[in-house]
Amino acid sequence: FLGLRTLTVINNAVKNVKKNYGISLDMQKIDYNDQKVLDSLGTGRTDGVFQLESGGMKGFMKELKPHSLEDVIAGISLYRPGPMDFIPQYIRGKNRPDTIHYDCPQLEPILKATHGCIVYQEQVMQIVQSLAGFTLGRSDLLRRAMSKKKLNVMEKERQAFVYGNEAEGVPGCIKNGIDEKIANKIYDEMIDFAQYAFNKSHAAAYAYVTYQTAFLKYYYPVEYMAALMTSVSTSLPRF
């Protein structure tokens, strides 16, 4: 698991804090919307912070300026091929909510938390359920087909999404009052996105580790960096 070494670093940093200050930190009970920690991410000075150490991520965090853990989760999800194309739109919507445009009213409750952008696989499932009347099972099958790039399945489901499938109990977008061109546009965006998308639970698990490392670095930099450097030194080749 990618974060396994980082979990060890966090555990050792907590031990260092206990040793140096007599403070018993419970990382599950820290404030996960501490503005000082979030502001530190927005500076781009994120060396040693899980998932945010690359030059590209540092630059993205400076643009994003996360104000909540939700922003961190979305940021980790967006910084990937495919979803990365939505980054300018996401940042614009975050900073200027008046610029957000929803292709149809049904999208607003699904995409409002992510500033009008599709960010998670779960949102694709919600869209096809809300706009076209897909069942939960059918929407999950479509999500899998998109992630595996099964073009024949995606094209078949496009017909059901836009025009419906009466025999299978799918009303479709047009029957639900959504324009045909708009429905096809939404479907195209879902295909482009879903090929590379994270599910939210996966991104959230990473973001929690990201935040914990940022919290420790901000409040206990000596103890955290000592734990981090020790973890690196033990993996270096011995001569």
Regions found by a protein language model. Give the residues of each.
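Noncatalytic, beta-rich nucleic-acid-contacting surfaces in large DNA/RNA-processing enzymes
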Residues: 1-239
